[in-house]
């Protein structure tokens, strides 16, 4: 058995398929995926991810979701409603990205995707194997929200950890937690 260990020790390491891009000190860049909407808890999650990315030499991906409309209007009206929802999501994601850039000097990756939120997020994680963590914000009061509930229940089947950031935290509290790591 010792000979086998010695033999294996002499082999070059296989490349890590999840290693992805390299950041500071040639370490794998940690990418934090934040699902953005117009809620305060999403803003809190984004703040956590941007501070954490700054501290780790990583980056942020912003995923803005455009849920399918639950009603069907006449063809042209339906297309207009869907286009307006897409434009609102793009404006919101770009505004959030601008805030991150203003604070950190690093521009996050922005993606706007239509569809079922859970399916879109799972597909994004599948397509971006270098995501280090999915960062979601929980509502300060009441239910944590459908995405937090869903992904907390299915955390064991995800390719990365899920960070749930309490919506009741103040900005200084979020900054302190993100700066020291979790």
For every predicted segment, state its role.
Residues 64-91, 172-182:
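Acidic, proline/glycine-rich short linear motifs
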């Amino acid at each position: 058995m010792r000979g086998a260990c010695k033999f294996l020790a002499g082999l070059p390491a296989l490349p890590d398929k999840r290693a992805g891009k390299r950041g500071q000190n040639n370490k794998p860049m940690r990418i934090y995926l934040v699902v953005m909407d117009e809620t305060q808890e999403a803003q809190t999650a984004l703040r956590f991810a941007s501070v954490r990315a700054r501290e780790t030499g990583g980056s942020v991906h912003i995923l803005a979701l455009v849920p399918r409309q639950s009603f069907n209007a006449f063809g042209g009206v339906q297309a207009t409603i869907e286009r307006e929802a897409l434009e609102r999501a793009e404006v919101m994601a770009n505004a959030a990205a601008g805030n991150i850039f203003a604070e950190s000097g690093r521009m996050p990756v922005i993606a706007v995707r239509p569809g079922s939120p859970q399916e879109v997020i799972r597909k994004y994680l599948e397509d971006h194997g270098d995501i280090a963590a999915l960062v979601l914000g929980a509502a300060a009061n009441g239910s944590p929200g459908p995405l937090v509930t869903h992904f907390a229940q299915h955390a064991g089947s995800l390719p990365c950890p899920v960070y749930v950031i309490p919506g009741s935290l103040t900005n200084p509290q979020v900054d302190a937690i993100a700066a020291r790591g979790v």
